[in-house]
Amino acid sequence: MGRFIFVSFGLLVVFLSLSGTAADCPSDWSSFRRYCYQVFQQKMNWEDAEKFCTQQHRGSHLVSFHSSEEVDFVVSKTLPILKANFVWMGLSNVWNECAKEWSDGTKLDYKAWSGQSDCITSKTTDNQWLSMDCSSKRYVVCKF
């Protein structure tokens, strides 16, 4: 009886220690570290893509990257499905928010940005980010 309790307790410890290592993702989502990812084969503009992601799962948004390993994981999921293409990332209007002053140090008190806002895409083949018109249609990767 004592041996059974010891073995049962040992299995419980192993289960509990492993339960926190991966995300608890829906069956059609892929997990990497503590996050869940889903590649969608629909093309949409950035705003619709972000809204779409928020409707897929609580806490879901367009993909964000925080390491080269995370990019490699997403590439491993997107490339077989989407081939060489682009997916939206959760970055937009970066140029409007970036520059707060001119290179000579004077305050940016006048702006003449074009009406076109820029959003950021990631290539499905490697870790390259590109600025594109937010109204263009690209594939979607959601993350939560």
Swiss-Prot record:
Transmembrane segments: none annotated. Residues 32-143 form the C-type lectin domain. One of its GO terms (molecular function) is toxin activity. Keywords: Disulfide bond, Hemostasis impairing toxin, Platelet aggregation activating toxin, Secreted, Signal, Toxin. Heterodimer of subunits alpha and beta; disulfide-linked. Negative results: does not show affinity to coagulation factors IX and X in the presence of calcium ion. Also shows no inhibition on thrombin. This is Snaclec trimecetin subunit beta.
